[in-house]
Structure formats: structure tokens, C-alpha cells
Amino acid sequence: MRSVRLSITFNDQLNELLAQGEDRFGERVIAEKKALVYQTIRNHLAYFPASRVRDPDLGLHLYPVSGTPFVLVYDFDEAELRIHFVLHKRADRSTIDPADVEW
């Protein structure tokens, strides 16, 4: 299994996205969605990171998290899975710059 590195950018984005839905959906749903994101990273992407095709414009992989409105943006090698961003599935991806990631 690969080690997993989560960027500070990912963490901030996830917290912001979850906070946007808290009033509408409640704490329980928000906690479930957060758990789904982390379970997907730990139980699937860490083992099968190549299960999604690389976006040619970004040079990174995109993975929609089932049961959530979120898409993970990541790269990997044999030793490590690196989660760069998390976005809403309808977000404009053309403005993403991998150089903006804070680790």
C-alpha cells in the first residue's frame, strides 16, 4: 500500500465545501460525506490510484467520490499517493494550477 499525503490545500478545501452544506444538510450528513472522502482515499485510491485516467490538461488524476458531490485531484508513484485538491463536481477545472498546492 502507498503512503498517503494530503495537502493543506485539500484539507482547507474539504472543510470549506463541507461547511457550505452544514446548514442545509446537518452535521450528521456532513460527517458521513467527510468519512466517505477519507474512506475512498484510504481504502481505494491508496491501493488502486490508476483506476482513473489522467487529465491531460492538468497532468493529474480525477476521482469522483461516490455518494458525494466531490472530486479528488491527485497524483501518485509507487511509494506515495498525493491528494492535491478536492473540488465540487461542477467546479470549473480550467483554473486549477497544481503549482498553487500548499503542502
Model-derived features: where do they sit?
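Charged, solvent-exposed alpha-helical segments that act as regulatory interaction surfaces
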Residues: 23, 27, 47-54, 92
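Arg/Lys-rich, positively charged N-terminal/basic patches that mediate binding to nucleic acids
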Residues: 1-36
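Acidic/proline-rich low-complexity IDRs
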Residues: 5, 13-16, 57, 61, ...
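A short, surface-exposed loop/turn module that caps and links secondary-structure elements
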Residues: 39-67
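Enriched for short, Lys/Arg-rich terminal
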Residues: 67-103
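Conserved N-terminal glycine/acidic-rich loop preference
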Residues: 12-17, 42-43, 50, 70, ...
